[in-house]
Structure formats: structure tokens, C-alpha cells
Regions:
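Alpha-helical protein-protein interaction scaffolds
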Residues: 1-108
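Polar/charged alpha-helical tracts
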Residues: 9, 23, 31-32, 142-149, ...
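Extended, non-membrane alpha-helical segments enriched in charged/polar residues
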Residues: 13, 32, 36-39, 75, ...
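Sequence-level detector for tyrosine residue identity
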Residues: 30, 80, 102, 110, ...
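C-terminal/domain-edge helix-coil "capping" segments
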Residues: 52, 61, 75, 79, ...
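Long amphipathic alpha-helical scaffold segments
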Residues: 65-66, 70-159, 195
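A generic structural signal for ordered alpha-helices
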Residues: 125, 129, 195-196, 242, ...
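Surface-exposed short loop/turn segments
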Residues: 145, 149, 153, 157, ...
Length: 304
């Protein structure tokens, strides 16, 4: 049987994007209907302004360990932040930078190439601190900076809010191109996240970009509907040129968006429509003040 820590960790790592907003703003309204789910989510992703330990009352309601369980969940928070490409604000700065396995240093430190900064991250509170100057040491530094410039233009053109990064990986034989865009709309009961990770080999005779595009959306008004997609991507580029590489990536993301749109239309007109209950057409007005006394099989159908 799984331990309390293992169960709590699995909830944390599987939490939908932005659900801390639901947990705090909608907690009273949904407390009875979704109490276990909301409580777990409330401790898994936190608003920028309040530490996760402020949700200790929720933890106490779910586990006998109460807030004492938080330290044992640190690995789960770290995995979540790196996998979901969580963004943090650098101290004294307005821009957000992302956290991933590709820009990780020793301990809980990460680096951002564009701002030339390394920083420490508290994975529980999702806050950055101890920022220091950082100089990228890579034989592909010029390519990385060129990719960042083109990626910045792509992000500005196609995403309302977006964080991105380009990092040397695999002993400097390849670079990782990483992008994340979040849209949170708790007042309309939905939150979403777009993630894209691409690997570009730089010391290969054939230049093929491989990667994945992931879209996660959660809709929770009077229900609980989630969209989780994972699209493998393989792109051939004629040369290791930053402009052409980002152009191919932009085309792949646009094509996938159109593919998702077609899938939504097909699902709405097919599967979802088939789920609706088909009621008989009687061409008779319904007397709503008497609806509580109707015998559905007879009165509505006009029978006696």
C-alpha cells in the first residue's frame, strides 16, 4: 500500500495548471463537492505572494502528518516545477524565467541565458532568490544567443504571455529549445498550459529537430473535464541557422493548433453530441409550473 508521502506526491505531480487560483478563490464554493481534490492542489501550486505552508490546514484535513509532511514532498515539488516548466520572477526584475532540467545547476540553482543570471529556487514557494551573474560557457554560445533572439520574436508574435530558453545539453553536442505559455482564467473556470521542448543536435551531419508539444487544459465549472495532449515532433532543417530553425518550429506549432481545432469540432459534432440524451419532439408547450408533477413517459409525450 502506498504511503501518505507517495500519495500526496502523486497528486502534486499530477496537478492541473494554475489550480492554486481555484483552490484559494473558489475554496468555499466547492469545498463540499471537491474538497479532497482542491486541498491537494492547494498545497501543490502556490500563488506568488503566499507560501505553500499557509495551506497547512488543508494538509491537516487530509493527512495525519499535517504541515510536517511538506519537507518530505520536496522532491515532488521539484519534479513538478521542472516538468511543468514553472516560471519564477528574478529578484528585482519583472520578467519571468522558467525552471527545467535543462538549465539546472548544482543544488536548487538554475540559470537563465538571456539575463545572464543564476538563481536559487524554493520549489515549495516557487520563489527565486540569491541571484548572481552567470556567464554561459559553451562552444555553441553564439548559436544559442541567435536562437534566443529568433525565439523571442516568435514568442512575442504568437503568445500573449510566454517564457522561453535555449540551453546547451548532452555535453554541449546539442541545444534544448524550451517554451511555455500559461493562460489562467479561474473566473471562467478554466486554466491552460502550452509546453514545447525541442532538441537540436549541432555536431551531426543531418540536422533533425526532435521534440514534443504538450497542451494541458482543465475546465471545472459544474464538472471536471481535462485535455492532455502530447504531440511528438520531428523536423528537418537545411542548416543550423537560427532563423530557419525557429521558422520550422513556428510552422509545427501552428499546424498542431489547427489540428487541435479540427479535433475539437469533430469531437463536439460526434462523440459529445452522441452523449446527449435524445428526447421526443412533441410540439407541445411545457407548463413549467407543473413540471414537478409530470409523468415524463406520458404527459410530455401527450399520452394519458
Amino acid at each position: 500500500m502506498a504511503s501518505t508521502t507517495e500519495l500526496a506526491s502523486s497528486f502534486i505531480e499530477g496537478a492541473p495548471p494554475g489550480e492554486h487560483l481555484l483552490a484559494r478563490r473558489r475554496r468555499r464554493r466547492y469545498a463540499m463537492q471537491f474538497r479532497p481534490f482542491i486541498s491537494i492542489v492547494a498545497i501543490s501550486i502556490v500563488p506568488r505572494t503566499k507560501p505553500i505552508l499557509s495551506s497547512s490546514t488543508d494538509v491537516k484535513a487530509l493527512t495525519s502528518d499535517g504541515p510536517d509532511i511538506i519537507p518530505s514532498l520536496a522532491p515532488a515539488f521539484e519534479r513538478y516545477n521542472e516538468t511543468q516548466l514553472t516560471t519564477v520572477k528574478l529578484p528585482g526584475a519583472s520578467q519571468e524565467v522558467l525552471i527545467s532540467e535543462y538549465n539546472k545547476l548544482e543544488g536548487n540553482r538554475y540559470f537563465d541565458v538571456e539575463s545572464q543570471t543564476s538563481f536559487e529556487v524554493d520549489h515549495v514557494t516557487q520563489e527565486a532568490s540569491a541571484a548572481q551573474s552567470y556567464v554561459l560557457e559553451s562552444q555553441n554560445a553564439d548559436l544559442i544567443k541567435s536562437l534566443l533572439k529568433s525565439l523571442s520574436a516568435h514568442a512575442t508574435e504568437h503568445y500573449r504571455t510566454c517564457s522561453y530558453g535555449v540551453y546547451p545539453i548532452e555535453d554541449d553536442t546539442a541545444v534544448a529549445i524550451v517554451l511555455v505559455a500559461n493562460r489562467y482564467s479561474p473566473n471562467n473556470f478554466w486554466n491552460g498550459r502550452f509546453r514545447a521542448i525541442y532538441t537540436l543536435p549541432v555536431n551531426s551531419s543531418s540536422t533533425t529537430i526532435s521534440g514534443q508539444i504538450k497542451v494541458d487544459v482543465h475546465y471545472y465549472e459544474d464538472g471536471n473535464v481535462a485535455l492532455n495532449t502530447n504531440k511528438p515532433v520531428n523536423l528537418s532543417v537545411p542548416s543550423v541557422d537560427a532563423s530557419s530553425i525557429i521558422s520550422r518550429i513556428a510552422a509545427a506549432e501552428r499546424d498542431y493548433q489547427e489540428e487541435l481545432n479540427r479535433a475539437f469540432v469533430s469531437t463536439a459534432e460526434g462523440v459529445f453530441k452522441g452523449l446527449r440524451r435524445q428526447l421526443p419532439i412533441t410540439r407541445q408547450k411545457v407548463e413549467w409550473e407543473k413540471v414537478g408533477g409530470y409523468r415524463l413517459g406520458q404527459d410530455i409525450a401527450g399520452g394519458r
